[in-house]
Curated annotation (Swiss-Prot):
Protein name in UniProt: Putative succinate-semialdehyde dehydrogenase [NADP(+)]
Family designation: Belongs to the aldehyde dehydrogenase family.
Gene name of this polypeptide: gabD2
EC number annotated for this UniProt entry: 1.2.1.79
SUPFAM superfamilies registered for this protein in UniProt: ALDH-like
Function as written in the Swiss-Prot or TrEMBL entry: Catalyzes the NADP(+)-dependent oxidation of succinate semialdehyde to succinate. Although it has succinate semialdehyde dehydrogenase activity, is likely to act physiologically on a different aldehyde(s).
Assigned keywords, A-Z: NADP, Oxidoreductase
PANTHER family: ALDEHYDE DEHYDROGENASE-RELATED
Single GO molecular function: succinate-semialdehyde dehydrogenase (NADP+) activity
Amino acid sequence: MPAPSAADFARLRSLVAIEDLDARQSRPIEEVFTGRELTTIPVGTAEDVAAAFAKARAAQRGWAHRPVAERAAIMERFRDLVAKNRDFLMDVAQAETGKARSAAQEEIVDMMLNARYYARQAVKLLAPKRVQGLLPGVVKTVVNHHPKGVVGVISPWNYPMALSISDSIPALLAGNAVVVKPDSQTPYCTLANAELLYEAGLPRDLFAVVPGPGSVVGTAIVENCDYLMFTGSTATGRTLAEQCGRRLIGFSAELGGKNPMIVTRGAKLDVAAKAATRACFSNAGQLCISIERIYVERAVADEFTAKFGEQVRSMRLAATYDFTADMGSLISEDQIKTVSGHVDDAKAKGATVIAGGNIRPDIGPRFYEPTVLTGVTDEMECARNETFGPVVSIYPVESVAEAIEKANDTEYGLNASVWAGSKTEGEAIAAQLQAGTVNVDEGYALAFGSTAAPMGGMKASGVGRRHGADGILKYTESQTVATSRVLNLDPPLGISGTLWQKAMTPMIRAVQKLPGR
């Protein structure tokens, strides 16, 4: 199966929210597997962003008044179209990112899961909710959820479909419009799904895709949006949070991680070693929730390391548009430099390479072997810094308590994995880890795929949550409407303020004793 055709890219290019496309400056888009130019993409400006927001605001007013069930029906149709066009979508994802097809399929599944969950739950989650009022029977209190307006989404290159589309689905269902800035390396991943959203019945102005540099297009989105969703580095997240703070708008972000795995002496080592290959090396480790640190009880550390090393050395690297490759390419020369820099630094300072450790230009220009290190110490760059590539370090520990302490000894707190002798032990360990998601007997997919549950980071790994009720309600403004059924709190005619306050005191005491107070 080859990369998508020139005709495919030309069709998708026409969906960019930029006027006079052919007159604009453009940048090349490369096939990561080979480094050859596939097509080009127009480069947006701040004026393009402003124009997209103007159209989005006009369209959003009518969209917000449409019944939630009508919006949900569009997302159900979108889900069906994603399933129908999944092979083409995976081709686009592989061409722009260089990931293995199994990692591309994860993006398809994620979009389908989110579209189905929110389409089925939005009516319930967004419905006015009756809550207990000040005086039962006297005061009726209802909470409404109004859309923010126009949401800005700034998405990354590593999972460019899941992290642009899946984050936009609940925003749209909540009654907002969305303006997306895809990463400059992967704009067609977003455009390919925009095409399906429009085909499903979403008005085009409600979902605008404006490609361009973050310093220009990203800044303009922050200056125009009513809420910002960002996925990317912690450093950039801090900058965007400051910009949102100055405008007093809401902000949600999934940021960096240095995710730990704990393997206890009672774990099934064969199963854990095999699962760790996917947990560490899915999308060549370019996954925010992938594992970069493994803490193993010393009694089984040598055995686990041997089994894991054998699994990793047997992985197949290939530049192929089918499911025969276990791992694909890194996306860019910058990624190659970071990964090789971390590994070379570790080797120079005494770390041992158990598997991998080499660039593989014989396969493609940006391939790097899945790499396992031991003997990593704190002065090595890979010890505490996020590599965001196919590199993991194994650390023997004396006890589970030490493993938990070391797992938590990081500025990050995005994801963690636990392999123990029983589910009960695994869950007990999980509850002590400072991570937004923890998987027991799995690396990352169980928590990430549980779309009814919130997903996000603690500490420097993020703000806010995607998925679950949190993932849609964050795109709304809560409004409390309290209605007096009988009287207000002013003294009735003919009753003095002093007498009224004396009468109110026992009433307030009685209310405080009611259930739920």
